């Protein structure tokens, strides 16, 4: 049973969400502020639902502290129209965001999509015949360990960032649409103002060292998508 840490200061909302998620088969632990969430966080937590506006330590500061020690998947719960919070959350390593008020089915679908990705990584680790290790320039992507390294040095990537990078490497030199990336990486259909994939690409550009061959890692083709640049 997957364990979810639900972090929100709205006690009525957390009570309703806890009941909903437990009916969907999840084990739910509740925290009402960021400090309490960090105290409860351990390796048994499979995913965090993290509200932005909270007392003591808000969601952004909590995410920043969390990412120093854990790569646990995080879905940020933001106020509708709060574009700055969404962008900042994604920059700091959130996997996805969901604006309030949200549809219960959409929340459950987002959770299941991210957990499927995490379970895929675990299966790769336990399967000698899983997806192959990929190499681009001095970058090595090992899906079994969900680990990226450059020139032998491990890169600190979130699970979502690794999945996105691996998918683009699988289609090296080919354009992959934002719609396909959103569906495969985040498990959701792309909406007109959804910038999650764009922000994850931006994070990868910031985290990846310069290539030895002098090429950029990615090209943006407006209206079409992204491609990972091949050496040729």
Curated annotation (Swiss-Prot):
Major subcellular site: cytoplasm
Superkingdom of origin: Bacteria
Post-translational modification: Phosphorylated by CpxA.
GO MF, one annotated term: DNA-binding transcription factor activity
Stimuli inducing this protein: Induced about 3-fold when stationary phase cells bind to hydrophobic surfaces; requires direct contact with hydrophobic surfaces for up-regulation of Cpx activity.
GO cellular component, one term: protein-DNA complex
Gene3D superfamilies (UniProt xref): 3.40.50.2300, 6.10.250.690, Winged helix-like DNA-binding domain superfamily/Winged helix DNA-binding domain (1.10.10.10)
Regulation of catalytic or functional activity: The two-component system is activated by envelope stress such as overexpression of some (misfolded) periplasmic proteins. Activated by spheroplasting (which removes the periplasm) in an autoregulatory cpxA-cpxR-dependent fashion. Cpx two-component system is activated at pH 8.0; in a degP deletion mutant activation is halved. The CpxA kinase activity is inhibited by periplasmic accessory protein CpxP; proteolysis of CpxP relieves inhibition.
Modified residues (4-aspartylphosphate): 51
Subcellular location: Cytoplasm
Disruption of the gene: reported phenotype: Loss of the Cpx envelope stress response. A double cpxR-cpxA mutant decreases transcription of degP. Cells are less sensitive to killing by nalidixic acid; double cpxR-srkA disruption mutants are as sensitive to killing as single srkA mutants, suggesting the SrkA protein kinase is partially regulated by CpxR. Hypersensitive to alkaline pH (greater than pH 8.8). Decreased numbers of stationary phase cells bind to hydrophobic surfaces, cellular adhesion has altered dynamic properties; no induction of cpxR when cells bind to hydrophobic surfaces.
GO biological process: cell adhesion; negative regulation of DNA-templated transcription; positive regulation of DNA-templated transcription; regulation of cell-substrate adhesion; regulation of DNA-templated transcription
DNA-binding segment(s): 131-230
Keywords: Activator, Cell adhesion, Cytoplasm, DNA-binding, Phosphoprotein, Stress response, Transcription, Transcription regulation, Two-component regulatory system
InterPro entries (alphabetical): CheY-like_superfamily, OmpR/PhoB-type_DNA-bd, Sig_transdc_resp-reg_receiver, WalR-like, WH-like_DNA-bd_sf
Domain Response regulatory per the UniProt entry, residue ranges: 3-115
PANTHER family xrefs: REGULATOR OF RPOS (PTHR48111), TRANSCRIPTIONAL REGULATORY PROTEIN CPXR (PTHR48111:SF39)
Function of the molecule: Response regulator member of the two-component regulatory system CpxA/CpxR which responds to envelope stress response by activating expression of downstream genes including cpxP, degP, dsbA and ppiA. Required for efficient binding of stationary phase cells to hydrophobic surfaces, part of the process of biofilm formation. Induced upon cell surface binding, subsequently induces genes it controls (cpxP, dsbA and spy, degP is only partially induced). Binds and activates transcription from the degP promoter; binding is enhanced by phosphorylation.
SUBUNIT field: Interacts with cognate sensor kinase CpxA.
Record's protein name: Transcriptional regulatory protein CpxR
Gene expressing this chain: cpxR
């Amino acid at each position: 049973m997957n364990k979810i840490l639900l972090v929100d200061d709205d006690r009525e909302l957390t009570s309703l969400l806890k009941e909903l998620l437990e009916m969907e088969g999840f084990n739910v632990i509740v925290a009402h502020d960021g400090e309490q969430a960090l105290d409860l966080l351990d390796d048994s937590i499979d995913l965090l639902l993290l509200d932005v506006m909270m007392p003591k330590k808000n969601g952004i500061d909590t995410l920043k502290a969390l990412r120093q020690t854990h790569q646990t998947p995080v879905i940020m719960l933001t106020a509708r129209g709060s574009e700055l919070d969404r962008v900042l959350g994604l920059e700091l390593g959130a996997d996805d965001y969901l604006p309030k008020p949200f549809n219960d089915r959409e929340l459950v679908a987002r959770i299941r999509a991210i957990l499927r990705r995490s379970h895929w990584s675990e299966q790769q680790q336990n399967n000698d015949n899983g997806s192959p290790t990929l190499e681009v320039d001095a970058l090595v992507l090992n899906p079994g360990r969900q680990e990226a390294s450059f020139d032998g040095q491990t890169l600190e990537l979130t699970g979502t960032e690794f999945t996105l990078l691996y998918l683009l490497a699988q289609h090296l030199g080919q354009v992959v649409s934002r719609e396909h990336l959103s569906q495969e990486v985040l498990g959701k259909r792309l909406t007109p103002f959804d910038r999650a994939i764009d922000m994850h690409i931006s994070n990868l550009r910031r985290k990846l060292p310069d290539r030895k061959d002098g090429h950029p890692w990615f090209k943006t083709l407006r209206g079409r998508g992204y491609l990972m640049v091949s050496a040729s």
